[in-house]
Each structure stands twice: as structure tokens, then as C-alpha cells.
């Protein structure tokens, strides 16, 4: 699998296919989203919200939760607000989350 990924990436870079994804580091919609890392949401969440590349900072973890007020999720949100101009934060869960019912 790694060889396939590396080969695809090589061709992607050589053909400059990345150019159509160019965006500022500052989110166009001044939006940050905290959501679950569930693979079903990879394309679904931005599509369901009408978001395009560069519109929002999307932070993902298991369950889309802030477990530690001094952890990496909170740090990412603080940087988004204080450095990257984010004005709106959405916390979005989903049905059938695998984290539901797990003990930490």
C-alpha cells in the first residue's frame, strides 16, 4: 500500500495537480470545526456543510471531544482563534459513533 501511495504522490506532484487546491492558511469562512475522525465523515462533512478547500480549519479526533482543557484539541482551537482569525467554532457529532459507550 505504501508504494502505491508514494507513486500516486509522485505523479500528483509532477503533474502539479496540487495547484487547484491552493488556499490561504487563514480560513475563508473564519470557521473551525471539531468533529470525529470517522472515515465516513472525510468527504461527507464538508459536502454537507457546503465547504470547499480553504473554508475552515477541521480538527478531528476519536469522538470529536475535548478531553483535556490543556490538550492538543484546545491548543489547535486557540491557535485558530488567536492566530488564524477564526470567529466561529462548530462541534459536530454524528450517529453511530464508535466512541459512544467506550470507557477511557
Segments the model singles out, each with a brief description of its role:
Residues 1-70:
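Short, conserved "active-site rim" segments that organize catalytic pockets and cofactor/ligand binding
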